[in-house]
Amino acid sequence: MDLEKNYPTPRTSRTGHGGVNQLGGVFVNGRPLPDVVRQRIVELAHQGVRPCDISRQLRVSHGCVSKILGRYYETGSIKPGVIGGSKPKVATPKVVEKIAEYKRQNPTMFAWEIRDRLLAERVCDNDTVPSVSSINRIIRTKVQQPPNQPVPASSHSIVSTGSVTQVSSVSTDSAGSSYSISGILGITSPSADTNKRKRDEGIQESPVPNGHSLPGRDFLRKQMRGDLFTQQQLEVLDRVFERQHYSDIFTTTEPIKPEQTTEYSAMASLAGGLDDMKANLASPTPADIGSSVPGPQSYPIVTGRDLASTTLPGYPPHVPPAGQGSYSAPTLTGMVPGSEFSGSPYSHPQYSSYNDSWRFPNPGLLGSPYYYSAAARGAAPPAAATAYDRH
């Protein structure tokens, strides 16, 4: 079927620049498809023709056919959309007045709350209600600032003046704080403008020979001259910075000059107090400690040799097994009451049939000074006894 005879293509002489698409159809840039072609696309679609076949028969691009059919299925219309236009205006004077009224009643009202209230009071319907972003734009442009009213030029100056005042106050506070040099020396710092002017003058008066802007000690001294520090304070600061770092103030060897007594007065008093405390701790007297507190007590040192002859309160004495050297009867009688223990050597019936080598497989245990007295041990190595005495 030849559609060119029934549906002539539009001319391009009066409507603008045109062209021929890949299918051989003629189109005009910026103009919609003619209504007769649109109607034919819908008719072929109702007949069950596929969009790709419609595109080839009518020589219209596949995207154009799909767009026309999609709009027809959604809205039932084959009319073209507005080209270069926008959505219908929702910010009508009535809506703007209502939004302004809501903001005057409640300045903290959110945009979504305004939108819900417009729908609740039937000022707008679902199609004409402005979006949240549109309401925010209306509030910024038309509610907070009335139309035809210029922005006051003094607002910028007010903001800048406030910021300058705040910065200057912060600078003044930091200069007068206790962590600065002025705060340590107890000097009242002048205004920030005076300090800035003096710094600028110092930079101009003291050029650096190598061309860099890093100041040296001479520049700092020249900068600090004037009302900031006196000559005596400058000398004190120079001595402090020339002093060797990490030096011990109690063992310094340099002689202290008369003008340096103020620097070391606090340090000397602290050192003197520490010396007195050391002396008091080294030689305590009953008068200093107090009569109610007992003095230091000394306890005898019990070595490994005499450990066998000592007992702890509440525990029975240590009695070595039979055949390994035992205590005499008077010794046991003096250590514990006779009614509790007998004078015969201690033996257990369970181990009566075993010899000593089975009960003590390690011969080193038999030579330990812990189990024997001085008489039963015999000639023991002096190094072992000495090592045990230390522990």
Swiss-Prot record:
CDD domains recorded: PAX
Descriptive protein name: Paired box protein Pax-5
PTM per Swiss-Prot/TrEMBL: O-glycosylated. Phosphorylated by SYK. This phosphorylation plays an important role in the abolition of BLIMP1 repression by PAX5 in order to trigger plasma cell differentiation.
Organism: Homo sapiens
Region described as RED subdomain: 94-142
Disease: A chromosomal aberration involving PAX5 is a cause of acute lymphoblastic leukemia. Translocation t(9;18)(p13;q11.2) with ZNF521. Translocation t(9;3)(p13;p14.1) with FOXP1. Translocation t(9;12)(p13;p13) with ETV6.
Keyword Glycoprotein attached: yes
DNA-binding region(s), chain positions: 16-142
Positions marked as site (Breakpoint for translocation to form PAX5-FOXP1): 260-261
The protein's role, per its UniProt record: Transcription factor that plays an essential role in commitment of lymphoid progenitors to the B-lymphocyte lineage. Fulfills a dual role by repressing B-lineage inappropriate genes and simultaneously activating B-lineage-specific genes. In turn, regulates cell adhesion and migration, induces V(H)-to-D(H)J(H) recombination, facilitates pre-B-cell receptor signaling and promotes development to the mature B-cell stage. Repression of the cohesin-release factor WAPL causes global changes of the chromosomal architecture in pro-B cells to facilitate the generation of a diverse antibody repertoire.
Location(s), subcellular: Nucleus
Keyword Nucleus set for record: yes
SMART domains: PAX (SM00351)
A Pfam family hit: Pax2_C
GO molecular function: DNA-binding transcription activator activity, RNA polymerase II-specific; DNA-binding transcription factor activity, RNA polymerase II-specific; RNA polymerase II cis-regulatory region sequence-specific DNA binding
Residues with site note (Breakpoint for translocation to form PAX5-ETV6): 158-159
Chain spans, region Disordered: 1-21, 182-218
Site keyed Breakpoint for translocation to form PAX5-ZNF521: positions: 303-304
Region described as PAI subdomain: 19-75
UniProt keyword terms in alphabetical order: Chromosomal rearrangement, Developmental protein, Differentiation, Disease variant, DNA-binding, Glycoprotein, Neurogenesis, Nucleus, Paired box, Proto-oncogene, Spermatogenesis, Transcription, Transcription regulation
Quaternary structure and partners: Interacts with ETS1; this interaction alters PAX5 DNA-binding properties. Binds DNA as a monomer. Interacts with TBP; this interaction allows PAX5 to interact with the basal transcription machinery. Interacts with RB1. Interacts with TLE4. Interacts with DAXX. (Microbial infection) Interacts (via N-terminus) with Epstein-Barr virus protein BZLF1 (via C-terminus); this interaction inhibits BZLF1-mediated lytic viral reactivation. Interacts also with EBNA1; this interaction promotes EBNA1-dependent transcription.
GO BP of this protein: adult behavior; B cell differentiation; cerebral cortex development; embryonic cranial skeleton morphogenesis; lateral ventricle development; negative regulation of transcription by RNA polymerase II; nervous system development; regulation of transcription by RNA polymerase II
Effect seen on changing residue 183 to S: In ALL3; confers susceptibility to ALL3; reduced transcription factor activity
GO cellular component: chromatin; nucleoplasm
